[in-house]
Amino acid sequence: MSNQVFKQNLDDKKGPQPGGPYLIQMLFKEPVEMPDKEKMTAIMEKHIGSTECFCYDKKMAGFAALDHVAEFQDGKCPVQLMVMGCDKFKGKGFDAFLMSQMWDCQEDRERIFRECKYQVVATDMLTAALPALERANLDADFLEALAELYPTCEAFYFQNCGKLLLAEDVRSHQIEGSDRFIRFGVNVRFFNIEGTEDMLIDTVGMSTLFLPDLQYHFHDMDPNWVVNHAYNVASYILEHDNPIQDGETIDGVADGQMCREIQWKCQYEDALIQPPRGVLDINMGNYASGGR
């Protein structure tokens, strides 16, 4: 665990924005060609359903996901999935703060950034107009198509949440449905509050779907229990389109397990740690820190 000291910076506008793109950086040791148009279209259709390739060259390929229609005030159209051509990867923008929260790749993150000199960037477009659950499943399907299209990919970086994962972990997962988005599109972060015994755990990535991220400010509980609670609550919020109202309670934790006998109160607040966003702050009762 890192002993580096970071400062709160809620003026940081560089971070992910609510409803922003689900942008994936695929990292490679060697340059890679754009797969041919027919192959890309076939694999996209296999994972996503009815697909139309509306642009294709060495620099970019674009696909309309015909089963996923975004509706706007002045009309509607299928959402788009874009894949860029291979480019050099210089590791810019990955500061110590971001690196400190790459929990899935702690053993490999420095090696990945050292060895991977090339990247392919992929992103969704117009998807902010979709319902949260539909977008979550589409983005997860898109990721699985990319993993199949680029077998030499070493690692995936998910810009919306700051997660870095080895490609083999993406390819070998056994997760189904919307929990795939929770696994790859939501990061649970952990911070010690300097000069105190307090800890802070929050999520980044739920706001991509216009859903609340979570925040816990606490002491004297195993942080791994809280991390598990955060992933479980995030999954519940996504699956049920955020049914939790301000001031309501949810099941707390006892001995590492969700427990109905313990109720923790929820309230909507602004995040304590960047990026600026709305969060569902979970008051952990006897374990809670900070004034509310």
Please name every model-derived segment.
Residues Q159-R292:
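Aromatic/basic-lined ligand-recognition segments
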Residues Q25-F28, V32, T127-R135, F218-W225:
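Conserved aromatic-histidine-acidic binding/catalytic patches
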Residues D36-M40, P131-F142, D222-H229:
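Short amphipathic alpha-helical segments
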Residues E45-Y56, D141-F156, Y236-Q245:
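Structural alpha-beta junctions
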Residues G20-E30, C116-T127, I282:
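Short, hydrophobic/proline-enriched secondary-structure or compact coil segments at domain edges
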Residues V32-R111:
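N-terminal low-complexity, intrinsically disordered segments
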Residues M84-N187:
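Internal, hydrophobic cores of structured domains that mediate oligomerization or house catalytic pockets
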Residues M1-M44:
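N-terminal alpha-helical "arm" segments
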